[in-house]
């Protein structure tokens, strides 16, 4: 069907969203995630044997297998044990300075790491409430649980926190007491003066009540191994949504240590594409291109079913080799997270969707026949016999061990037998070959593919391209042709002004275009075109484009527009992208003194510094327009939580979240230096804030009586 036919009812502009994934809002997943999770779990079992045999693969405890069992034509999960040991030793011998840096990190920085760093995560599975929660709340709850059971405070260091987790896991039974909000109905009779009773009145009172739960040792281990699964939201250019996993706070500390150690090593390896920033990645690619050889080639592509074919045991084995000269406690510490992931249980969600004669219903997994019934022997049931999770010994989930998996790929790719340079970042890679002949180069490419298969990583034949001579390739969505490296084509259409703050919207757009020109992602002609497109979008978002209510309103004043967001012609060109609009207009004598004063006046509602009003992931919250009629607040929204949440028992957690927000913003106001780096103060947070406030009052220009009154008020 022709998309532009009049029957579709779509304008050419609207069809743009159907053709190009980077315009319009990003897709959001909804509905039951069970199918996606089960597909994730089933794949590693399907790929384990050359001839698919899922029932037999379910009994596999470890992913190690012989070279004859590795499929060379299709994805293969599992790894060859001897190869992983040999390749790990080779990498260790090749980069001794990287392992010296790791030793220094383990001896010094590991001991100083604080468990508070775990609060930086996003959504985390709460093992106590079986639901996702913001990381700080989940961490606070876990600390409370540990202290209640051990009867002692937990030290600030990460190691003391992990020791407490291990102690709790060894206890035969643990308990946790927490508060929930309840709605109590009260009945009252209204009494009249003559003693008669009136109608019955009912009202609700909100009260908090305490609940105690008991967890056995087996249940706690199960909770430690359980991963919360979620849809991966806002993914552009994909037909099917994917799932990601999040471990609970019991496992997160162990994962953090292993990933931080992997980061230390990767920072020292020339073939690593992580954890460096964008500019450094571009520099790495440019430097690798300066190759002089008879035949050069460049292989760029992806690894196929990367997470499903990875095996936790392969990464555990690699780390054990890296740490063979270390004390036993270090080896055990690094083994624990991989053992947890070896026994992982995926939370499978609400159930599978079935459709018959137009009726759609969701049934829990196992109730009705499905293509995933082979996995039923691995199902985990709750006390009522309902399937809540599925055990998965092979494979991994997205979002887990990104840095360790990169390290595993590098031990196979960074071998002395393979010529040229390799850059790897999770499942994305680029390899520059230097060879004497084309035959030699093809042999090298096959050697690279087979080396990666030995550790359980599969190059995707359909997504890989080998270009000779070297000079054209793609890595991390950045395309390059010789020394030109850029990805601005995919970025530009999503650069849409928000329509909330005229000043920052304009600055943001100009910065992106300026940065693209500075880093040679665009030349001046493309930059000028991008600037014109952005200017049009900017004026459109402030209703200053064409004939709108706002343009009619401004016209009625019989006053020429002053700024771009009022409909004035743009003053920016490719050479003035770095300058602020108001300054530039004043310098060009397009703004008079009076107009400048009016714009820059701090009490002017347009430029007044207001608190940040928008705090959002808009998908989960409803916009509510604030009742504020000042000119500067025309575009102000706040996102409120759905009313149903505030009436649920979880209201206590929302109150806790609010308290955390208040206390952190209060501490930041007391200690502005916190925005730059960590500050250490003697005493508790309360004492430190009190001392700082007293100092501010004493140093101020206030009258003595007012100072005394303020200090007395603080003491009371």
Swiss-Prot record:
Catalytic reaction equation(s): RNA(n) + a ribonucleoside 5'-triphosphate = RNA(n+1) + diphosphate
EC identifiers of the protein: 2.7.7.48
Alphabetically ordered keywords of this record: Nucleotide-binding, Nucleotidyltransferase, RNA-directed RNA polymerase, Transferase, Viral RNA replication
Cysteines paired by S-S bonds: none
Domain of life: Viruses
One GO BP annotation of this record: viral RNA genome replication
UniProt enzyme class: transferase
Annotated InterPro entries: RNA-dir_pol_NSvirus, RNA_pol_PB1_influenza
GO molecular function: nucleotide binding; RNA binding; RNA-directed RNA polymerase activity
Segments forming domain RdRp catalytic: 286-465
Pfam (any one): Flu_PB1
The family this protein is said to belong to: Belongs to the influenza viruses polymerase PB1 family.
Subunit structure comment from the entry: RNA polymerase is composed of three subunits: PA, PB1 and PB2.
Protein name: RNA-directed RNA polymerase catalytic subunit
Organism this protein belongs to: Dhori virus (strain Indian/1313/61)
